Amino acid sequence: MIKLIRFFRSRRCWVISLQARCFSAPSRTHFDFSGESSDTERALVSALGSCASSNDVTCGRQIHCRVLKSGLDSNGYICNSVLNMYAKCRLLADAESVFRDHAKLDSASFNIMVDGYVRSRRLWDALKLFDVMPERSCVSYTTLIKGYAQNNQWSEAMELFREMRNLGIMLNEVTLATVISACSHLGGIWDCRMLQSLAIKLKLEGRVFVSTNLLHMYCLCLCLKDARKLFDEMPERNLVTWNVMLNGYSKAGLIEQAEELFDQITEKDIVSWGTMIDGCLRKNQLDEALVYYTEMLRCGMKPSEVMMVDLLSASARSVGSSKGLQLHGTIVKRGFDCYDFLQATIIHFYAVSNDIKLALQQFEASVKDHIASRNALIAGFVKNGMVEQAREVFDQTHDKDIFSWNAMISGYAQSLSPQLALHLFREMISSSQVKPDAITMVSVFSAISSLGSLEEGKRAHDYLNFSTIPPNDNLTAAIIDMYAKCGSIETALNIFHQTKNISSSTISPWNAIICGSATHGHAKLALDLYSDLQSLPIKPNSITFVGVLSACCHAGLVELGKTYFESMKSDHGIEPDIKHYGCMVDLLGKAGRLEEAKEMIKKMPVKADVMIWGMLLSASRTHGNVEIAELAATELAAIDPSHGGCKVMLSNVYADAGRWEDVALVREEMRTRDVEWSRAFSGVV
């Protein structure tokens, strides 16, 4: 015994007392000291538990050797302790060896091994062992439920929980908290309320661990009234509880309620401040987020890398903001610029701010081998129309990931180089270990839409159907848009109807089919689809109304178009932009209501562009209005003096009116100024 004590002390793994801090919760479950164990057993079990907690494999192996030499491996408690040590340290080959040679396997042995498999994310092995267990307890079921939850198999976790309940196995607070977490990801409100009722029935609702998970569940399911009611009724709250409720308001966009709750937190931590900053950024309130950030610094809190990434990314989205430069200075001052992802974010910030030189300088000063920085530079070049430079960086990147390929393929698709986008896509699927994802396919279908090649579109669609890429609304919208732009509106409509009741929870697929139908002259179909949309809890957006107004324009439905235009702001809170005004000018102009079209242009919040004045000029010629034609031509020439199309159109207006002297003057002016002739204008759609 004295030699054993000296050995443990020499390895610094001797634990003098058997206090609870020496063991994790599972250890207390596995081992029972009722006074029958000898001091040697206690010492060994305690030391092995300490090794498991501290992940001290070297010391654990040495103790295992001493156990074998002493012949104590026949002792069930000690053997389970050795098994637990290897399982906790994720040395499953050693754990399996001990398990096979175990002389006295019991339910604790099986539970330890199942827990080891779950910790190492070997769920299949855990399931196989679970199925052959001679006796399953609450610990067995709880461990496997945790395994399902870790692998995002929420439905399976709930199913196993129901099996456990049907067998009459009593659950504990760990089981219930784990199941509540799984249920929160499934989003079923009735299951949520059932679990809360169960917690009350088992008198576990007062446990902070359980009640906090219940609160988190309601927040994830966006049942914030239930969440707040539970929060107010909780007998005990900790900072985690406050932060969960705060995060629920923040994620739901309820900033005022979040602010009110935030002010009530007496001891805020970095999570509390970060939640408020994140909530403001989600609402595009950068200035408010920076106020919280500044106040946080005054309270002595240090920002995290993730927080700085979020703030700088938001600054990049805020056009004309100088906040990003100040944040960059703070990042350098605090030494955050050595973090790889912050370096990539800084590159992205300058690229989006159209300062590609500074982005390139930041890249040169960063760790060039870091893939995120290279991807940021590729995307930056693409954003600034420098596709060749982007390709150069792409070709020099040896460890390309999915973001590298997506940035480059998207760059070609956006820069009107669809053939190059498709060529790179074929290279990706034939020679790269990186496989396309949904974002890749969106860019591919966009490129095919530009080409108008139905054959290419069908090939890409076939590839998608045989792949493992999960569908989403944006991908569905891209497919619908591709078929519509390639002239196969029936196929686009079939795909829309096949998917709208299965996965469509956003506006994207609706926009694709409405705009596609309108573009190809199916105005009634587009407007009928919009009517169907209004009966659903899906909100239209700016793009939706471009399609709707285009449909009205094609069908000559002036009054209906005006009604929809006015409803944008009054009914949906959408401010019309230049595309919507362009649709209305085109609609009014084609109907011969040129004065109204002119007044519409005057009311625009932004200056009319070449397209809008061109449409008014074209409509003026169609309806023989020389005065408005002269106005449109003058405005058009002021925007683009080198564009000869307006002069040609104006001379044709004069010719139609028989004003041949004016025709001669316009033609002479064109020859004098060497203005290029442009023969045509096209409408918005």
Curated annotation (Swiss-Prot):
Gene Ontology terms: cellular component: mitochondrion
GO biological process terms held by the UniProt record: mitochondrial mRNA modification
Transit peptide boundaries: 1-23
Main subcellular location: mitochondrion
GO molecular function, one term: RNA binding
Stretches the record annotates as Type E motif: 612-685
PPR repeat extents: 40-74, 75-105, 106-136, 137-171, 172-206, 207-237, 238-268, 269-303, 304-338, 339-369, 370-400, 401-435, 437-471, 472-502, 506-540, 541-576, 577-607
Subcellular location: Mitochondrion
InterPro entries the record matches: E_motif, Pentatricopeptide_rpt, PPR_At4g14850-like_plant, TPR-like_helical_dom_sf
Keywords: Mitochondrion, Repeat, Transit peptide
Family, per entry: Belongs to the PPR family. PCMP-E subfamily.
Protein name per UniProt: Pentatricopeptide repeat-containing protein At5g19020, mitochondrial
